Amino acid sequence: MTLLRHLLTATALLGASVQAAQGVTGSPFGFASGTTGGGDATPAAPSDISQLKTWLSDSTPRVILIDKEFNFLGSEGKCTNCECCKPASNTCGSSGQNAVKQNGSDWCGSYPTLTCTYDNAGIEGLEVASNKSIVGVGSSGVLRGKGLRLVNGVSNIIIQNIHITELNPEFIWGGDAITLDGTNNVWIDHVKINLIGRQMFVAGYEASHSVTISNSEFDGETSWSATCDGHHYWTVLGYGHNDKITFANNYIHHTSGRSPKLEFNSFWHAYNNYWYNNTGHAFDVGKNTRALIEGNVMVQVDTPLLADSNPGAVFAVNTSDVSTCTSTLGRTCVPNTLISSGTLSGSDSSVISSWPSGESDVTVMAASKVASYVKANAGIGKLGNGSGSSSTVGAAATSAVAKRADSDDAPFVPAYSEAGPGASAVPTQPSWSWRTVTNGPAPTGAPSDSPSAPQGLGAPVQASNKHHHQGHGRGY
């Protein structure tokens, strides 16, 4: 028995050392196909948070190994007895989320003012320059107290196998885990995100082309919930104009909204994701966005698709329209499966007919395989289980339209045990940041979440309410 333990330990260490030597595992697929990150740069691990900051932001192509926890808590001091507010959504006191009052923003409006203490490091993420691979080693790669920020035209970045956590989870505006704004070729893979104050992932107003988010875990279990139910509301937000994003093989659980919320002339392909225990809404598709939703599984999701007063186009595949994809995509689409959930409907064929080129190496598996696959593969420390990349899932195709669906694409109802566990301002500059906010005009028609009045832009919307586009701003 002792020998067996030693063998298992040696095997694990060997796997970690092999990964450390090679850097990125697998190859990007979907819209991020062709992304190389730091390329063939020699993988290296920074010694401390100062060196990590430097390596992330310099102009040198790098493969940066995150081989331990980098703890940013306290590294930029704390804001003590600073001004916050209590939004109307917080009806549960210390179990809810109050909001940091940001300079230059009137998001707090007439909400009661409070004093609060929060960690400065979490408010804004680490700047990431072009041509970087950020790769966690084994299960050790943790960024605590600070996220990542990709803005101002950066490109060719891979983020793989890391855990981002503890960004002022008590506070709205406490920080975002991963921010994109004006990027190209970004692959986010095998990332775990939890205990975040604001968005787990956000794409800002500037277009983020050629992005894939895959095999990642969005863990919404929290002690500070904007919806007062232990579920995180601010999950995935796509606000970029003309974003092209593949969202595949992800595990989204214990959330209550924005899972995802999408706007503004973008294309999102969401396939083979597993949603579990969402007490509010999953998809919120607005203003000119086109969403292709196929081969997903939703279990205990109250509102799979939120009604919107200005909706975008949704093609959510069911058994009756799988053949609609054939003429344009060259394959049948794969039906979604919903268990103990609300309705996911949408059959706007313009999504299919207008689908852009550039999404490649896509294989959509049957819903019958999704729950077990995603639970085994999504998140940190699971690279050896299969990356979901073109090298492990399927042979390359010239585009998404050319790739055949999994042959076993009949709808599936799994056994239940398989389910698993105010108005504000907008940045007037391309560099999208919560700190650099002015009171300039917002882009035309920017939407807002609005539960029962009087709510500010960006407040959590209740599943039973429709959108009211009553303001403009950065209130994401």
Swiss-Prot record:
Keywords: Carbohydrate metabolism, Cell wall biogenesis/degradation, Disulfide bond, Glycoprotein, Lyase, Polysaccharide degradation, Secreted, Signal. GO terms for biological process: cell wall organization; pectin catabolic process. It comes from the Eukaryota. It catalyses: Eliminative cleavage of (1->4)-alpha-D-galacturonan methyl ester to give oligosaccharides with 4-deoxy-6-O-methyl-alpha-D-galact-4-enuronosyl groups at their non-reducing ends. Glycans are attached at residues 103, 131, 277, 318, 385. Residues 465-476 have a biased composition (Basic residues). Residues 1-20 form the signal peptide. GO terms for molecular function: pectate lyase activity; pectin lyase activity. InterPro entries: Pec_lyase, Pectin_lyas_fold, Pectin_lyase_fold/virulence, PEL. Residues 426-453 have a biased composition (Polar residues). The active site is at 258. Its EC number is 4.2.2.10. It is found in: Secreted. Disulfide bonds join 84-108, 325-333. One of its GO terms (cellular component) is extracellular region. Residues 412-476 are annotated as: Disordered. Belongs to the polysaccharide lyase 1 family. Pectinolytic enzymes consist of four classes of enzymes: pectin lyase, polygalacturonase, pectin methylesterase and rhamnogalacturonase. Among pectinolytic enzymes, pectin lyase is the most important in depolymerization of pectin, since it cleaves internal glycosidic bonds of highly methylated pectins. This is Probable pectin lyase F. It comes from Aspergillus niger (strain ATCC MYA-4892 / CBS 513.88 / FGSC A1513). The gene is pelF.
